[in-house]
Amino acid sequence: MIEMKLWKKWLTTIVASLSLCIAPAAMASAASTAQILLYGAATMVLAKQQLLQMDNNNQKQMLANTQAKTGVVNNEAYSDRLENIQRNLVATGLIKRNYDVYANPSTDLNAFETIGGVISVNKGMLDALNDDELAFTLCHEMQHGEKRHAINGVLKSIGISTLVDVSLGGNADVLDILLGSVAVNYIDNEFVTMDQEKQADATGFNVFKNTAYNVGGAASSMQYVYEQYGELWQEGFKRI
């Protein structure tokens, strides 16, 4: 992992070199602006690297933290159903990551994927959808994981100004703590772009059509949720 101090040293060198090209009258303000922009860009890169490491290596911890936050449905029938569908999707050879999938007790029609390849499906969705529809839902959520959408969502939820403040503080441990906390709480208010949703639908369907499930389950699952919530089906997500 690249230490924050190395980033600061690198940026200070760049800002100093920039000052040689700036007229004296504008040097102070321009250097300050350049420094902020450079620190912001570098911190975004560093934060993304750390989140990628969490996404790849912290699955057990993220699973435990997420389950503690959402609760878990201890129902063998639900667990077996999810495991069976997941196994069928993985058998296509088109799923590259490992996912931990579990049911939570919420009665809302929803499911989510978060840092660590953790996927949670609400009890309400398990009760409402048949296996074809649920399989497409899991295809969709797995594609969020394959494309690392949660990483970008966490970065957006923190904001560039907060990352710059942490960077200028020079304490890498603070950034670790911040990212860990936001990653766990991210499930309460996901930042998912409409382009990411469309991508998850399209690439998810590419997986889905290579299974034995009825491809009509893709359309019927989305139609069912729309009929229940109308335009409010997006509630709980920040769409950009």
Region spans (language model):
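Bacterial N-terminal signal peptides that target proteins for export
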Residues: 2-14
